[in-house]
Amino acid sequence: ARGVLGARLFDLVTQNRRDGRLGFEDLVIAKSLYEKGTRDEIEEFVYQLIDTNGDGIVDRSDLESVLLVIFESVFSHEDSVSASSSLPDMVNVFLGASTFAKDNGTDAEKCLSFEEFKSWSALVPSVRKFLGSLLTPPTKARSGFQVPQLVHDKNISDDGLLLKKEFAWHIGGALSSNELEEWKLLYHSTTSGLSFNTFLGSVANDEGPTLLIIKDGEGCIYGGYASQPWERHADFYGDMKSFLFQLYPKASLYKPTGANNNLQWCAVNFSSDSIPNGIGFGGRINHFGMFISANFDQGHTFACTTFGSPCLSKTSRMVPEVIECWRVVHRSPQQEKQEGVKGSVLERFKEDRNMLNMVGIANSSN
């Protein structure tokens, strides 16, 4: 961890002694709490971690400092933050879903309570994953650090994409590591036109999960993760892996609540008003969580219990301006298995073994 986040983590691990010394016992205690504690204990540790001043108050400036460190750490080997967005702008996007309602007893701005932190971190799981993995080995698949490679034709520049690397990292917070290797652009309305038939043709040969992303006429960007292929159905289909997300002007993610199974919608060439032609997610017929008509010229987003999501756009009725669809390329089970069994058992558990060696029990026969 870098900067203020690294300094704060050091203070917490050394139990705030402020003597500049880190003992092995400090590390063992911290890791047992940070990685093996109860859910509430881990959340409390992370909440203390984002209190960068250690004053018991988590305000907006604390979160701004934390997010700056996160972005610098995650994207240090990338092309920095996307050219179309400055770092402060991206920080504001990720703070958009936070609520500072707690009175800190002074005339200063409101602060973030522990419960408000838990609510916010559920909406930005990539941030929570990063903060929860700072004491783990810095591997390629380190939780919270993975950014998928975005593959697209050269006739579309990075600046012309709705899906920026920071947004991909945000969405990836809800996915497994084997889904964060590569995402391939299948359809972009700027080059293919706003055409439902072209869209369906572009995604027809890809059976894996996809990301549908929309920028509407008001400038809002949002979408959904479709776990199942886009195929003709007369009713809702899909599974509980699907979710909705917002990317701009605020970043948030909404997973299924279990309230119903109205997850994914794809109706093509039906003549009944009760089966609206188009694609969407959640809610109910004609009152979807997100929906684009088959003409790709209009749609709507309503608050829905399927994902516990609010209206994703500024108003419930929206006009799509740009539509993208990305294929989430899965790493094969064989590849994952091969990577998982490299080396001997002792080599694979080298970190734990080193810790045991330090306390003299790794080679004990008892």
For each feature predicted by the language model, list its residue ranges.
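Phosphate-recognition beta-domain surfaces
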Residues: 1, 6-7, 11, 29, ...
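EF-hand Ca2+-binding helix-loop-helix modules
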Residues: 1-50, 60
